[in-house]
Each structure stands twice: as C-alpha cells, then as structure tokens.
C-alpha cells in the first residue's frame, strides 16, 4: 500500500520506466522464442545453457523461495557478445519467475565464486543483472550470497559496492561454507559447495520442433489475451474502490482478493500461449498442469520428493 504522494509518484514513474524497458528489450518476444528460437537466431546463445552457468537448485523451506545457483567460473566473458548475454539474463530471469510460488514473490541467489579468474569477469553482464534486479524486478531478491570469493574479487567489489541500491546491498552476504547459507537447507545445497544434493538438473537440451509461444497476431493468443484483459479491468475497478476506502472496507478487501485470484488463474491459463517451453518443463519440474516439483537426490542415497507445488499454494517436503 503506497501511502504518500511522493511514493505514489515514484511508483508510477518506476512502473512506466519498467514497461518502457520491457517493450524496448522485447521481453515477451524473448520468452516466446525460448531456448530453441533464440539459439536458432544466435549461435552464441546456444552455448549458454550447456555451459551450466545458472540453474535452480529447488525451494527453500521457509516461504518456499526458488534457490538460484550461478557458477561464475563457467562464464567466459570473451566467448559471446554483450547482446547475447543481455538476452540470456532476461530469459533466465523470466524463466525463474515461473518457479515462484504464491504468495511469495522472491528468490534466493547464490553466486559460487570458487575458481573465479579475470577471464570470468564480465562488467556488462554484472551491471545488467544489477540493473534488472534494482529497476525492473523490484523486491524480487530475498537474499544474495557470494560464496568463496577469491582475493582478486576484493577490488571488483570495491568498485561495484557504491553502485548498489542500499536495499540490494543489505541483502548480500559473503560466506565460505554451505552452512553459512542460512536460508538454504543443506539438502538443497549442491555437493559442489559442501551440500547434500547430487545430480542436480543443470540443463536439458531443447528438442527440434519444440513448442514456442504464439505470435502476437495469432487469433488464439488474441482471444486468450482479451479474456485476461477483461478480468484485469474488473480487478482495476475494484482496486480503485479499495484505494478510496484506504483498505478499511471488509467487503472490498474480500472482493479484491477474489478478483486477484481470478486474474492469477487466468494468467496461468494464458501463459502457455505466451511462452516457449523452458528446461524446467523439459525436465518435468514444471508439468503440463503447471505443477512444480523438484526431486532432491542426496549423497547418502536418499531421494527427497516434495508434494507438488502450484503457483497458488505450497506444501511441505517428504522423504522416500
């Protein structure tokens, strides 16, 4: 609830800035093309997934937040142009958003700096990530861990630190042991950083003919989009009344919550028409009904299988 006039003005300004960026960056075009379409257009993009630079480990116990692992040593800055990395960063950010479980809207990020050298240092990609986190996916980051940073990173950090928004800076922790990743359970931490999880799904190749998102002018997509917009207008109308009431009208509170659920469900229904398949669908982590399920193989031979999550509700983990 944005209370002051200044906050409202900043909110409107930032939202307009975000919409402008999404249009100029063709975010929806990127997610519609997916790994297959982007790789077809740009051979350098095709090497990003197989390099296993970034992937999701699973969910945290508290608040069910996706845990994103980034192996910096797997990124060789000179092997792809800046434009390719911009597309890859946007595609990864949008893909990880599909793993978010309502009502949580945040993710945890672990930068594994072990093996880092200057050939891995990519100012463009680093600044793109920071710019996106601060400006275009606000309040998305719950915590960011910089794991086993070598001494040569100290100079880089001194240059980067002043550029960070204070809210982002306060969410960054440096650590050297897996048990210092305090909001990431040990059974989710990868064995390469001292955790218990082995055989993590890091990359699954797209298959020829794999589904891509529909073109903006496709009649089916336009029909689904119109249906979504109709519900969004209903949500906007009740939200206007809710704002006037300052959130004090119980009937409007309930009506707005109901419209919010309708809107979220409609977008989940619409999403397959907007997005190409991601590696998490190819791996079966996101199934055809958009249920979410990670399987955690442990180094002691156990397999932990969570009850499926949905975009609307989360459940607890159980062991086999």
Predicted regions, residues:
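Single conserved hydrophobic/aromatic residue that forms the stacking wall/gate
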Residues: 2-8, 12, 311, 318-320
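Surface-exposed, flexible loop/turn segments at secondary-structure boundaries
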Residues: 75, 152, 180, 320
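Structured beta-strand/turn binding interfaces of compact recognition modules in eukaryotic regulators
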Residues: 70-73, 114, 147-150, 175-177
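Short amphipathic alpha-helices and their capping/turn residues within compact interaction modules
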Residues: 20, 24, 94, 98-101, ...
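Alpha-helical bundle/repeat cores within regulatory domains of eukaryotic proteins
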Residues: 107-159
């Amino acid at each position: 609830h944005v209370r002051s006039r200044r906050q409202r003005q900043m909110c409107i300004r930032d939202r307009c800035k975000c919409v402008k960026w999404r249009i100029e960056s063709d975010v929806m075009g990127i997610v519609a093309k997916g790994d297959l379409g982007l790789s077809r257009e740009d051979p350098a993009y095709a090497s990003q997934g197989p390099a296993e630079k970034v992937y999701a480990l699973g969910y945290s116990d508290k608040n069910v937040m996706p845990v994103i692992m980034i192996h910096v040593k797997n990124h060789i800055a000179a092997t792809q142009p800046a434009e390719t990395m911009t597309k890859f960063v946007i595609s990864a950010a949008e893909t990880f958003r599909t793993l978010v479980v309502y009502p949580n809207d945040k993710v945890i990020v672990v930068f594994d700096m072990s093996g880092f050298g200057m050939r891995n240092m990519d100012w463009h990609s680093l600044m793109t990530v920071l710019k996106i986190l601060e400006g275009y996916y606000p309040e998305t980051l719950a915590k960011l861990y910089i794991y086993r940073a070598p001494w040569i990173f100290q100079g880089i950090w001194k240059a980067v630190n002043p550029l960070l928004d204070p809210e982002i800076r306060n969410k960054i922790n440096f650590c050297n042991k897996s048990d210092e990743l305090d909001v990431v359970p040990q059974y989710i931490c990868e064995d390469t950083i001292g955790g218990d999880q082995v055989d993590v799904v890091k990359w699954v190749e797209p298959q020829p003919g794999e589904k891509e998102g529909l073109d903006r002018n496709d009649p089916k997509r336009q029909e689904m989009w119109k249906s979504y917009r109709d519900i969004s207008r209903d949500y906007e109308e009740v939200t206007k009344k809710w704002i006037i009431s300052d959130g004090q009208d119980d009937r409007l509170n309930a009506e707005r919550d109901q419209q919010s659920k309708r809107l979220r469900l409609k977008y989940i229904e619409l999403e397959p028409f907007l997005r190409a398949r991601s590696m998490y669908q190819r791996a079966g982590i996101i199934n055809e009904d958009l249920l979410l399920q990670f399987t955690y193989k442990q180094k002691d031979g156990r397999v932990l299988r969570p009850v499926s999550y949905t975009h609307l509700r989360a459940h607890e983990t159980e062991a086999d």
